[in-house]
UniProtKB/Swiss-Prot annotation:
The lineage of its organism: Eukaryota, Metazoa, Chordata, Craniata, Vertebrata. Residues 574-661 are annotated as: Interaction with DSC1. This is Junction plakoglobin. It comes from Rattus norvegicus. The gene is Jup. The modification N-acetylmethionine is found at residue 1. Expressed in the heart (at protein level).
Length: 745
């Protein structure tokens, strides 16, 4: 059949979305034929008839374009040469000869002669393929200048026909390599694609670039020819096959061509890609979302562009509505990248991202589950007030039973944040055996602070300020968690973990039944040791006039406050009170009354208030000269501090002479109790005032992302689940850790 007749036949178009897969071609190395344009005859390979194949290849150019007599003679000689080589090397390979072999075969049977001839036939076939490959390359190379000229023709009909021919050539490996080696032809294809308004021409030219993009040489040729801006322009095409060719070609460029990401960004590729999230073809969406991930990773400007174009909403919608695993995985990768962007995080959460991601935590795809877990963890610090997370919380509690380090890191971190300042979530986790699961996670974690620290923080949240807090406090003891928790106070544990553990111990001490186990675990000597060490370190900086530095994001003043506060609660028990007194702590507590930090003054006055209930301790407090600072604290702006100071003064004045007692009484009345009879009564009876108490002292924890390339630092919030306001001297942040993640390929 002649070439021009073939070209003029209607092009058979099939639904490309039914045929293409997520692999855009370069991964498998398959010489993918363009699924949307198929034509029989032109450049089709006929393995059984070498002569017919070669003749078709020859006539493609003798009739497709006007040629000189010399060209015709050249191609005829080329055809004759190939035919002579075939007949010389494989005399049985012609159409007539091969038909004889078939004619002798009995239907359904293979003769011994045919079996013996199989190796010979295979060799002949290989030689024929080799000859045909050479023919492809020679003919394509010969035709390139003329095809380039035709692509630049002013007649759109000529351009369309030339594009069809080049498209067919791009489907065969040998001719495709010849095309890649011609910068002029690739540039002509790019220009044609960019300037055409004809849909068939657009389809053919994008198909050509798609086929070339399966090879690194082709990617480089497209890039150098300015193909990226042209391909980005094609993302606005109404033809789905054109969209597919454009997005898969861009995908291959982003994956393997250096400089492609910047070129796509400069061509406003993100602005064109984000609206494509509204398409409804899962496989097309999988490639599109992977392009977004490649562009957004490590580039803050790209993340903001995605946000400005409604990307978070589109991505969450995909996670909510689709079940195609590759699409869910690629989409979760984009969300994971965006989830470390402070601007994108609230947008994802407000779009229902937490609930949409939670749907897939029970998926059979480990990589999807892991991406969802990391993304949930990253988002959880801005989702503490989100509703409808009951199922997510239950699944996270169940995930604590697995041994995978990444799963445990994500589950504990997310639970820690979602139980912060959320009484409903605390109650739900406690009622679903969350305390027991967290303790077991701590026991299995060993020295992995990325698991232990958020688990301790979550326990600290569960043991205070919600209806089931007392149940949680008892559950820690009943599940043998107290010894393991007290051991976490030992150095060289990281200071953030130590700080969180101190807060948890204070909460556990609120339950009287926990006092004996805490004492048996030697918690008081460890707290006192930490207190002395932290205070000495803080004092050195005060004496030197330098600002208190952070150690792993924790200031020593925070440790001083935490230890003193925990000892205050423990001192409510008579046995603990005696042990604290015997450790010679009163001089240090009196010293803390002079602190410039209001919170430290309060907890120091509070622990002295408890110790002063015993006469021996009260005398020791007086002997240390505590009266003067306590008198000053009567005028404190903090009512709790003033009340504790008044109670201590009242207690140590009991054995003083009448004049001293009268002076103290007048001072107390004038400064504190003039308008508050209840406070006066409390001071007289030594009943501690129900002053809210800070138990949340944790800083941000270390960002990690399962086995993925280092992403942006995770910005976790300062946990504020305490009973009194955040420390005014701490911003709750620690320097970012070195990234230790790698993107899943």
């Amino acid at each position: 059949m002649e070439v021009m007749n073939l070209i003029e036949q209607p092009i058979k178009v099939t639904e490309w979305q039914q045929t293409y897969t997520y692999d855009s071609g370069i991964h498998s190395g398959v010489n993918t034929c363009v699924p949307s344009v198929s034509s029989k005859g032109l450049l089709d390979e006929d393995d059984t008839c070498g002569r017919q194949y070669t003749l078709k290849k020859t006539t493609t150019y003798t009739q497709g374009v006007p040629q000189s007599q010399g060209d015709l003679e050249y191609q005829m000689s080329t055809t004759a040469r190939a035919k002579r080589v075939r007949e010389a090397m494989c005399p049985g390979v012609s159409g007539e000869d091969s038909s004889l072999l078939l004619a002798t075969q009995v239907e359904g049977q293979t003769t011994n002669l045919q079996r013996l001839a199989e190796p010979s036939q295979l060799l002949k076939s290989a030689i024929v393929h080799l000859i045909n490959y050479q023919d492809d390359a020679e003919l394509a190379t010969r035709a390139l200048p003329e095809l380039t000229k035709l692509l630049n023709d002013e007649d759109p009909v000529v351009v369309t026909k030339a594009a069809m021919i080049v498209n067919q050539l791009s489907k065969k490996e040998a001719s495709r390599r010849a095309l890649m080696g011609s910068p002029q032809l690739v540039a002509a294809v790019v220009r044609t694609m960019q300037n055409t308004s004809d849909l068939d021409t657009a389809r053919c030219t994008t198909s050509i670039l798609h086929n070339l993009s399966h090879h690194r040489e082709g990617l480089l040729a497209i890039f150098k020819s300015g193909g990226i801006p042209a391909l980005v322009r094609m993302l606005s095409s109404p033809v789905e096959s054109v969209l597919f060719y454009a997005i898969t070609t861009l995908h291959n460029l982003l994956l393997y061509q250096e400089g492609a990401k910047m070129a796509v960004r400069l061509a406003d590729g993100l602005q064109k890609m984000v609206p494509l999230l509204n398409k409804n073809n899962p496989k097309f969406l999988a490639i599109t979302t992977d392009c977004l991930q490649l562009l957004a990773y490590g580039n803050q400007e790209s993340k903001l562009i995605i946000l400005a174009n409604g990307g978070p909403q589109g991505l969450v919608q995909i996670m909510r509505n689709y079940s195609y695993e590759k699409l869910l995985w690629t989409t979760s990768r984009v969300l994971k990248v965006l989830s470390v962007c402070p601007s994108n995080k609230p947008a994802i959460v407000e779009a229902g991202g937490m609930q949409a991601l939670g749907k897939h935590l029970t998926s059979n795809s480990p990589r999807l589950v892991q991406n969802c877990l990391w993304t949930l963890r990253n988002l959880s610090d801005v989702a503490t007030k989100q509703e409808g997370l009951e199922n997510v919380l239950k699944i996270l509690v169940n995930q604590l039973s697995v041994d995978d380090v990444n799963v445990l890191t994500c589950a504990t971190g997310t639970l820690s944040n979602l139980t912060c300042n959320n009484s409903k979530n605390k109650t739900l986790v406690t009622q679903n055996s969350g305390v027991e699961a967290l303790i077991h996670a701590i026991l299995r974690a060993g020295d992995k602070d990325d698991i232990t620290e958020p688990a301790v923080c979550a326990l600290r949240h569960l043991t205070s300020r919600h209806p089931e807090a007392e149940m949680a406090q008892n559950s820690v003891r009943l599940n043998y968690g107290i010894p393991a928790i007290v051991k976490l106070l030992n150095q060289p544990n990281q200071w953030p973990l130590v700080k969180a553990t101190i807060g948890l111990i204070r909460n556990l001490a609120l339950c009287p039944a926990n006092h004996a186990p805490l004492q048996e675990a030697a918690v008081i000597p460890r707290l006192v040791q930490l207190l002395v060490k932290a205070h000495q370190d803080a004092q050195r900086h005060v004496a030197a006039g330098t600002q208190q530095p952070y150690t792993d994001g924790v200031r020593m003043e925070e440790i001083v406050e935490g230890c003193t506060g925990a000892l205050h609660i423990l001192a409510r028990d008579p046995m603990n009170r005696m042990e604290i007194f015997r450790l010679n702590t009163i001089p240090l507590f009196v010293q803390l009354l002079y602190s410039s930090v209001e919170n430290i003054q309060r907890v120091a006055a509070g622990v002295l208030c408890e110790l002063a209930q015993d006469k021996e301790a009260a005398d020791a407090i007086d002997a240390e000269g505590a009266s003067a600072p306590l008198m000053e604290l009567l005028h404190s702006r903090n009512e709790g501090t003033a009340t504790y100071a008044a109670a201590v003064l009242f207690r140590i004045s009991e054995d003083k002479n009448p004049d001293y007692r009268k002076r103290v009484s007048v001072e107390l009345t004038n400064s504190l109790f003039k308008h508050d009879p209840a406070a006066w009564e409390a001071a007289q009876s030594m009943i501690p005032i129900n002053e809210p108490y800070a138990d949340d002292m944790d800083a941000t924890y270390r960002p990690m992302y399962s086995s993925d390339v280092p992403l942006d630092p995770l910005d976790m919030h300062m946990d504020m689940d305490g009973d009194y306001p955040m420390d005014t001297y701490s911003d709750g942040l620690r320097p970012p850790y070195p990234a230790a993640d790698h993107m899943l390929a």
